[in-house]
Amino acid sequence: MPYRKLGRTSSQRKAMLRDLTTDLLINGRITTTEARAKEVRKTTDKMITLGKRGDLAARRQAAAFVRNEVADVIEDGDNVKVQSALQKLFDDVAPRFAERNGGYTRILKTVQRRGDAAQLVILELVD
């Protein structure tokens, strides 16, 4: 299966894809280069598909890839509930796409970066 090396070693590339995928799941949209966005789209689609499956094995596979970051902090009086990126994937993001089979993300081209003229894009989850 072909993939982009993105000018990095395999461990650096995997870490970058994990970070960008987690950020996309938490925030719903990220700004990055076109090549990175096309690779992150693949990993994000796989994570959302795991979220739709929802069984224990899918949770473990997603937990092995998605970073353990805080997605939301919900304060209700004295109670404080912290939602991780993995919980947000399974509780909020995956149910939004229950009726959709793939194609969970959209790439919108924006301006070129000033320093090196790299094409910047906005990668966002489809509504």
UniProtKB/Swiss-Prot annotation:
Swiss-Prot/TrEMBL GO biological process terms: translation
Gene Ontology molecular function: structural constituent of ribosome
GO cellular component: cytosolic large ribosomal subunit
Record's keyword annotation contains Ribosomal protein: yes
Gene3D superfamilies: Ribosomal protein L17 (3.90.1030.10)
UniProt KW keywords: Ribonucleoprotein, Ribosomal protein
Superkingdom field: Bacteria
InterPro entries: Ribosomal_bL17 (IPR000456), Ribosomal_bL17_CS (IPR047859), Ribosomal_bL17_sf (IPR036373)
A matching Pfam family: Ribosomal_L17
Similarity field: Belongs to the bacterial ribosomal protein bL17 family.
Subunit structure: Part of the 50S ribosomal subunit. Contacts protein L32.
PANTHER family: LARGE RIBOSOMAL SUBUNIT PROTEIN BL17M, RIBOSOMAL PROTEIN L17
Name this polypeptide is given: Large ribosomal subunit protein bL17
